[in-house]
From Swiss-Prot:
Belongs to the UPF0502 family. This is UPF0502 protein VIBHAR_05349.
Length: 217
């Protein structure tokens, strides 16, 4: 696998993939909308506090590598960005909808168990059960062009092993262990889902405000 991203680049790509699926009417994203998505408090781990300059620096680097493109029109005053990370005409990385959903979820939240991935990808892809998630993960881990994810050693007291993407290079297991938080309950997962929905509604409102302002500018 040739793609290697910084943490901010991974967040940018993850956000663009997510919004392409969940809010297609607002996609491609303006720099403001993309920055808001990167700093979203729900469905992000770790939570970041990036400036527009931070995000633009990452976007410019990704454009140079043809992983992001500026889709704004000739007379447009606002740049709009879309990812070219996978499933492009000339790109090497081809992912199914399920694979894309899993990769997106990992780019946004890091290492996760198959059960967590199934819950958190409910708006990105459909899985019948956890076993189906595990099968897709195994396929990604054994990709013929090089592994895209890796299965991590099972932690003491945990029933499931976590998986992590390899788009930011090899995984430092000891670092991940330090960053591990307490397991989520079903109630906290529901709260996370509600927080995500509120954040997305705010983004849609911000995008509508942008459109109105552009009409009167």
């Amino acid at each position: 696998m040739k793609v290697e991203l910084t943490a901010i680049e991974a967040r940018v790509i993850g956000c663009l993939i997510e919004k392409e699926v969940t809010t297609p009417d607002q996609y491609p994203l303006s720099l403001n909308a993309l920055t808001n998505a990167c700093n979203q408090k729900s469905n992000r781990e770790p939570v970041m506090s990036l400036s527009e300059a931070d995000v633009l620096y990452a976007v410019d680097a990704l454009i140079e590598r043809r992983l992001v493109s500026d889709e704004s029109g000739f007379n447009s005053r606002v740049s709009k960005y879309q990812h070219r990370f996978c499933n492009t005409e000339f790109g090497d990385l081809k992912l199914t909808k399920q694979e894309k959903g899993i990769v997106c979820c990992m780019l946004l939240r890091g290492a996760q168990t198959p059960g967590e991935i199934r819950t958190r990808t409910n708006r990105l892809a459909t899985f019948n059960d956890v076993k189906e998630v595990e099968n897709v993960l195994e396929h990604l881990a054994n990709d013929e062009k090089g592994p895209l994810v890796v299965k991590l050693p099972r932690e003491a007291g945990k029933r499931e092993s976590r998986y992590m993407h390899l788009f930011c290079g090899e995984v430092d297991v000891s670092e991940l262990a330090v960053a591990t938080t307490a397991p989520s309950s079903a109630g906290s997962e529901r709260i996370t889902q509600l927080e995500q929905e509120v954040a997305e509604l705010r983004e849609e409102l911000a995008a509508l405000k942008e459109q109105v302002e552009s009409l009167f500018s």
